Amino acid sequence: MPYGTRYPTLAFHTGGVGESDDGMPPQPFETFCYDSALLQAKIENFNIVPYTSVLPKELFGNILPVDQCTKFFKHGAVLEVIMAGKGAAVAEGTQAIATGVGICWGKDKNGDLIGGWAAEYVEFFPTWIDDEIAESHAKMWLKKSLQHELDLRSVSKHSEFQYFHNYINIKKKFGFCLTALGFLNFENADPVVIQ
């Protein structure tokens, strides 16, 4: 029996950072730092598959903090994510990394929810920062990106933008920072029947 395309109906938001004095070339921050960031984000035992940025309307109101979902996690499962994550080396001039994910929801001409879109933000800083700087920069850039996504599609804003952010001040040689949405439950659209 055929079935239609899959779409997520439950998600969580999370974030993590990692740093290390050790790493393997060519991207040393991708080795130990990335794993540490996944551990802090509580998604270290998933196989991570990145998405682009379109959200079905069924996710509206169904994006939870990661701590509400961890007891349902399955070791070795595939986790589909929208992730803003990057690593850096202090020797290359980066002292801090900020990341963020923003969400906008759109409505049709009748005011009904269509669905949503996400945007990712990553910024490197030459000096240490604090949470206020990380949050304000994330919101500034994500707001611009989310509004662009709505404008590009000629869609009106349904509700307030949502923002999630994270940052690290790197104290070792290498650092990594991530902010992510992870998708847990799925349904299927109706199958396509062409006659």
UniProtKB/Swiss-Prot annotation:
The record marks T52, S53 as: Cleavage (non-hydrolytic). SUPFAM superfamilies: Pyruvoyl-dependent histidine and arginine decarboxylases (SSF56271). Binds 1 pyruvoyl group covalently per subunit. Its cofactor is pyruvate. It is found in: Cytoplasm. It is an enzyme of class 4 (lyase). GO terms for biological process: arginine catabolic process. GO terms for cellular component: cytoplasm. The keyword Signal does not apply. Keywords: Cytoplasm, Decarboxylase, Lyase, Pyruvate, Virulence. InterPro entries: Pyr-dep_his/arg-deCO2ase (IPR016104), Pyr-dep_his/arg-deCO2ase_sand (IPR016105), Pyruvoyl-dep_arg_deCO2ase (IPR002724). It catalyses: L-arginine + H(+) = agmatine + CO2. The modification Pyruvic acid (Ser) is found at S53. Belongs to the pyruvoyl-dependent arginine decarboxylase family. Trimer of an alpha-beta dimer. Part of the AaxABC system, catalyzes the decarboxylation of L-arginine. The arginine uptake by the bacterium in the macrophage may be a virulence factor against the host innate immune response. This is Pyruvoyl-dependent arginine decarboxylase AaxB. It comes from Chlamydia muridarum (strain MoPn / Nigg).
